[in-house]
UniProtKB/Swiss-Prot annotation:
The gene is AMPP. This is Probable Xaa-Pro aminopeptidase P. Pfam families: Creatinase_N, Creatinase_N_2, Peptidase_M24, Peptidase_M24_C. The keyword Hydrolase applies. It is an enzyme of class 3 (hydrolase). It comes from Arthroderma gypseum (strain ATCC MYA-4604 / CBS 118893) (Microsporum gypseum). Keywords: Aminopeptidase, Hydrolase, Manganese, Metal-binding, Metalloprotease, Protease. GO terms for biological process: proteolysis. Mn(2+) 2 binds at D432, D443, E555. The keyword Protease applies.
Amino acid sequence: MTILRHPLRFLFKPRFLYFQSPSGQSSRPFSTSQILRTALDMPPPPVDTTQRLAKLRELMAQNKVDVYTFISSFTGSAGCAIVSMSKAALSTDGRYFSQAAKQLDSNWTLLKRGVEGVPTWEEWTAEQAENGKVVGVDPSLITAADARKLSQTLKTTGGSLIGIDQNLIDAVWGDERPARPSNQITVQPVERAGKSFEEKVEDLRKELAAKKRSAMVISTLDEIAWLFNLRGSDIPYNPVFFSYAIVTPSVAELYVDENKLSPEARKHLEGKVVLKPYESIFQASKALAESKASASSGSGGKFLLSNKASWSVSLALGGEQNVVEVRSPITDAKAIKNEVELEGFRKCHIRDGAALIEYFAWLENALIKEGAKLDEVDGANKLFEIRKKYDHFVGNSFDTISSTGANGATIHYKPEKSTCAVIDPKAMYLCDSGGQYLDGTTDTTRTLHFGEPTEFQKKAYALVLKGHISIDNAIFPKGTTGYAIDSFARQHLWKEGLDYLHGTGHGVGSFLNVHEGPMGIGSRAQYAEVPLSASNVLSNEPGYYEDGNFGIRLENLVICKEVKTPHKFGDKPFLGFEYITLVPFCQKLLDASLLTEAERKWVNDYHAKVWEKTSPFFEKDELTTNWLKRETQPI
């Protein structure tokens, strides 16, 4: 199995995007368009993958492999493809059932994850590996834990798992595979990071000492960027760079292409971090393992490794006998923002809110007053141009989801100029977008209607808004997980027999990845593992989607914080949320009669704050001021 986003997309001839494995190390740029068709109105036919699969199967035969498995993750989510000598399957979750059903050609079977009676991808793979067949994976693209799990599953049907150092998808790709990017690495100054990298490294060393570990090998890109207060742009929308790192009690090593370091970055690291060639990480890991093996009995400890690190890194360090796999302490530390980072989040959300307000005012005027014919890409491009005007803007934090009508029901829809729909002023319009700013990262979704919504659309909007408000108002004891509060967002939909097939909230980085862990809010088991903590930044984004008709999602970012309560049961602190996104909800979709008095007060208080914080940007912009005044009026 290959945990990587590009192989599946290569088989399907994707658009130009970069994707990364969980550790981020095997990301490659590629060209994405045909099979990943995105329009629901007149979708082009699926790309015929017959020849690509045939080439892959030739290589499988040469490597004496009966089944080849690899993971494909869309932005912020996951899918898995498995190819045997006669069959091919794609497993994905509810966010992509509709999209995948439209995009797969006849060579592929869709495995709907979580649906009763449908096998998991591991079970399906085991079925193909019956009677001694061999399953091959690229060990650099699967975690050690996932490799062990898959191996155990295969044994139940008599199959076996082997690692293949050559990535067979790359071999099929051949010369068409673009080169790895080599963009400049810059410093995130302590004035914005809130803590020096020397302090962060020292904190990690204390963690190693407490756990009696001799070193930590770090392979997750946003962890490395955060740890060393550096930022890059090797992966679009994510300010990270291709690298590895090793931290011991006495030395910090960064494995990176030195030519990418800006003069400022070199000075930043000089005398404190040893620079090593990116490609030498596996040799260095093996040397660590050999050094441990030759050391006298009892000296040193096992190596600390993230449970998201690749199987190949674990093997280079000597495998389970030398490695302890844990949730990375860097991930935990990164998720708890310091006061400088939190203030940056608050400030960048005021500017980003102003940009979205300006965009929505422009869009309504263009569609309704001017009668302009604008497609979904035109809208996304205009929003980007508006954001660029605001201070400290670096770029988008993900592909803008600009979707009209039925396209809004595809949860992670991405419009393409050749196939996207014209924005229909008589239909719902869902816009999910975000920006990367030097002082923070944003992610906001609003659903609007420029005409006359139906009564059901207004009711569905109210149910989603009620869930959004329920999360925003939640108060819970320290130690509570996002799994425990997820139902707060869904309860109003459930009473009507409705639901949505995605999580309610994800962590967000500080001028880093717009999706980060380890915490989140959702109904999957993973959300029950890590409690929410004060100073986490998360999204609050319930939704509702009606295939072939419309989608609704309402998303703010929130800061988890300690709150005052009349009592303190068990002497435990209680936590709640502070919203930082400042964009009005759609007046045409707001039906005050469907909200309680407390909910109406929440909306009115929210809109008053939106007006207070963003209206000063539009003192010389009558169009936007009038739109904002109308959209923030009390209900």
